[in-house]
Amino acid sequence: MSSSSSSLLLMMLLLLLLLLTSKLEAIPVLSSTSPSPGVRILRSSESIVAPLDDEVVFECETSLPPERFEWSYSNTSSSSSAISSSFIYLSSVAGKVNISHEYAISRLAIVVRPESLGEYRCVGWFGPLVVTSTIARLDLASISLATKKESHLNWRTAPGNSIIWPCGQQVQANPLASWSFYKNGKEIQPLNHNGTLILNNISSESNGVYSCMATNTASGVRLPIPSSMELHVTKQEGSKSPYLLFGQPTRQSVTTREGQRLLLVCPGVGSPPPIPVWSSPNVTAAVPNKRSKLLSYGLEINPVQVEDAGIYICYLDNGIRPPLELYINVRVEQAPVIVQAPWAGSLTNESDRLQLECQAKGEPKPTIYWLLNGKRSHEVNQSQLLSNGRYLVLKKVLKEHAGYVQCFARNHLGEHSAGTLLQVNPKLVNETDLVVSRPQRPKKLQIMVPPSAPNVTRLSDESVMLRWHVQRNEGLPIQFFKVQYRLINEGKRKMWQTTNENIPYGKPKWNSALGKNFTASVTNLKPQRTYRFRIMAVYSNNDNKESNTSAKFFLQRGSSLEPMPVPELVKIDEYSETAVVLHWRLSDDADEQSITGYYAYYRPSSFAGEYSKATIEGAKARSFHIGSLEVGTIYEFKLQSFSADSASEFSALKQGRTQRSKLTTTEQPIQQKGGDRNVNTTPNHNETYSLNPLLTGTIGGGALLLLLLIAFSFCLCRRKNRNGGDGRNSQNKPRLAELREDFLPLAGGGVPGSKQRQRSRHIHITLNPLDQQQQQPLDEKNTNTNLNSPHLEADPELVYFQRQQQNHPTTYDYDHGQRRLSSSSLRRSQRTLERTPGSNNNLQQIGSETTTTGQRVILKRPRLSSRSENLSSGSLNSVGV
C-alpha cells in the first residue's frame, strides 16, 4: 500500500465525517388543529309561552355526558331581573313532570298550570363538578285590552297624503299579537307595523270605515278592538301647511329589541302633501346610514342596534310655513352578554386569595350573580361580592371550592353565562408523629405521601395526557410511578389496568417550594368511552400507595370537536451548555382564555425514541427554560397547548442546540505602548476558541486512523525487505537433521546412582566450538556438583544429551552479527521443530546407543519457550529460563 493511496483514503473518510456532522436546519412539519370541547352547557332551554293545560318540553345539552342530570324550579311571577334563591330540584316520582335523558341531552316535559309557571334550569353533574344552564321561563299565553274605552275617529284629508292609524295601542299580549285589518267589514292586507295601519298615497278609493283585530299566536285567541276610523278623501281648495289629524300624537315613545326591524312613522298631512326630513340631536350618523331607509311616511332602521337609541326629529314641510316638528324617543333593549368571562388559571393553592372578574353589557343594565358548583355565592364559605357582583372574591380558597365557577348576567330579556374551572392544590396534611413506646426517645416514622389525583387532558382519539403533583414532604422517597385506568360502563365493573411504563421520580430535590409536577401519556384507549385514572407511587421500602381517582373522563372523537389554538415555535436560544430557552407565540385570533397551559416535547435529533415532556402552566406564558440537556447537542422541539379537557395538535417541529463546551486559552494582559496602556488583550468570552465535541472527536479519530495507516505501510515495507534478505542468508542456516544430531539422550534418562534435581532453573546449551572450549571446565565443575547433590531427583521431563563430536563432527559458521534474533524468529523455529514427525523418536534412538559418559552433560527441556533459546546461524545459545 503506497503513501499516496493512504492519504487519499484518509481525505475521503474525513470528508464523509464532516458531511455527516454538519449542522442540520429546522425541518418544518405541517400541523392541523385539534378540538377543545370543554365541560359546559352547549344548549340551554329557551323560554316558552304556552296556553293553559298545554304540555311543553324544556331541553338542554352538555358538551360531555354527565354522571347525572337534574332540573331545578323556582315559582316566580314575573321575568324581572330579580334573582330567585328558592330553586328546588324536581323529580319524576311525583308525576307532575317527566324527565328523560339521552346521551348528553336531558328533556323535561311539564303540563302548563298556574302552579307550574316560573323559571327552570338544567344541572349537569360531573363528579364533584356541577354545571348549570341559564334560566328558561314558562309563561301563560295571554291577550287583553289595557282600556275598554271605545274610540271612533272621523278623518278628512286631501289625496296624496299618508294616513297612519295606531289601532293596537291599547292591546297587551304575550307573546306579541298578530293583526288583521278590515275595511267596511272586509279583511284587507295593508301595510302595518305592530298594530299600526299605514295607508300610503291615499285617493278617493281609500274612503271607508277601518277596524282591526288582534290574535294571540300561542293560544289562537282573537280579540276584536273596540275602535274604528272613518276616512274621507276630498280635494281641498288652496294650500295648507302640515298638520296632525285628530288623535295623532306630537310625541312618541318607541321600545324595541336589538336586531329587530324598527319603523318610525311621521304622521301629518297637508296640501300639498308634506315631505318628511329626519335628524337626531344625540344619535351620531343616524340618518342616513347603511341600515336606514327613508320612506314617504317614516324612517326604517333594520337591524336596529343599541347605539341607535335616542331622540329623532321628523320635519314635515310642504313649502308652506310653519313646518311641523314631531319628536320620537327610541329605546333599544339588549339581552345581557358577558364581555369578560372569569378565569381562575391552571391551579390555585389552598388558602390563597382568589378574585374573579365578570363584565357584562345589556339594556337594561344586567344584574350579575355567581354560582359555584350550583350553589349561590352567599352559600359558599369565604366568598364575597364586590362592585355589584362584578367581582367574586374567595378570601381563603378551600378544597370544597374546587369545581366549576359560573358568572350569570340577567335582565328581563334573559340570561347569559360564562364559567371557569377552579382547580385547588391542597395543602400537605402533616400527620401526627408516631412515637415508640419509650416516651423519652420519641421516634418519627416516615409516611408514604401519595400523589395528587391526576388531571386528564385529551390528546387524540386514543390517548390522553395525565398531570399530577407531589407535595413537598418529609415522607418516604418515591422511586417511580405507575399509571392505572379503568373503563366505566353501565354493566359489570371493570378491573384497574396498569401501564407497563415506569415513570421515574427523577432527582430527589424539589422543583419549587410546593413540590414537583409530573406528566405521562396513556395510549391505546377507545374513543366514545368513559374512563377513570389514578397514579400509584412506589416508595423506597418497595411498598406502594395510590392517589385519589380522577373525575370521570369521556374520551370524545376529535371529528366532532372545535379546534384549539396551536402555538407557533418562534426560536430556540442557546441558554447554556445544558439548557435552552423556547420562545413561541399565538395567532392574533387565538382564544387565549381557552388555554390552560402548554406541553413541550423534546429529544436529541439523532435519537428516534420517545420524546421527553415538560408541562408549562399558564396561558400567558411565551417562553420556557429546559435544562438537564447534553452538551453541544442538537435537539428537536415541538409544542401543543392544552386545556382541562383537550389538547391542540403539535406545532411545527423546530431544532435547536445547547452551547458547545468551551476550550479557553487565557493569555496575560499586554499593555500597549503609546496611547492606551490599559488595553487588555486577553480574549473575551466571544473570542474564546471553542470546538464542537463531535468535531473534536472526528479530527482525533482521523489523526489516529492516519497513524494506523502509516504504521501499517511501514510494517509492509519492513516485511518486504526482510523477505529479500532471508533468501541471501539461507545458506548459513543449519539443517534440522544436523541440529538433531548434536543432541544425544543419556541411556536410562538419568545418572545412575545419583539423585537429580526436580528442575534446573538454568540450562546452558552451546554448539559453538569456541564457547565449548571456554565453557568446558566450568560445565564439568557444575555437572559434578549437580550429580553429587543430594537434592536431585528423577524427573521424566528432563532429558540429558551428550554431544558426540568425535563420531559426528559437524561444522557451523559463526557470525557475531547474528547471535540473537527476534523472539518471533525463535517461535517460528520452535514450531518447525514441533511439527517435524518422529523427531523425538530419532533422538531417543540415538541416545540409546550412546554411553552414559561423555565430555559434556547438558540439561535440556523437551519444549523450549521463546525466552529460553536464541537461534542464530551456526550457534544455539542458552539463556536463563
Curated annotation (Swiss-Prot):
The chain crosses the membrane at residues 694-714. One of its GO terms (molecular function) is hedgehog family protein binding. Residues 1-26 form the signal peptide. This is Interference hedgehog. The keyword Transmembrane helix applies. Residues 450-558, 566-661 form the Fibronectin type-III domain. The lineage of its organism: Eukaryota, Metazoa, Ecdysozoa, Arthropoda, Hexapoda. Keywords: Disulfide bond, Glycoprotein, Heparin-binding, Immunoglobulin domain, Membrane, Proteoglycan, Repeat, Signal, Transmembrane, Transmembrane helix. It holds the Pfam family Ig_3. Glycans are attached at residues 75, 98, 194, 201, 282, 349, 381, 430, 455, 517, 548, 686. Residues 37-138, 128-228, 242-330, 336-425 form the Ig-like C2-type domain. Heparin binds at residues 486, 492, 494, 532. Its main location: membrane. Disulfide bonds join 60-122, 167-212, 266-314, 358-407. It is a single-pass type I membrane protein. GO terms for biological process: axon guidance; compound eye development; cuticle pattern formation; homotypic cell-cell adhesion; maintenance of protein location in extracellular region; segment specification; smoothened signaling pathway; wing disc anterior/posterior pattern formation. SMART domains: FN3, IG, IGc2. Homodimer. Heterotetramer; 2 iHog chains bind 2 hh chains when facilitated by heparin, heparin is required to promote high-affinity interactions between hh and iHog. GO terms for cellular component: axon; cell surface; cytoneme; membrane; plasma membrane.
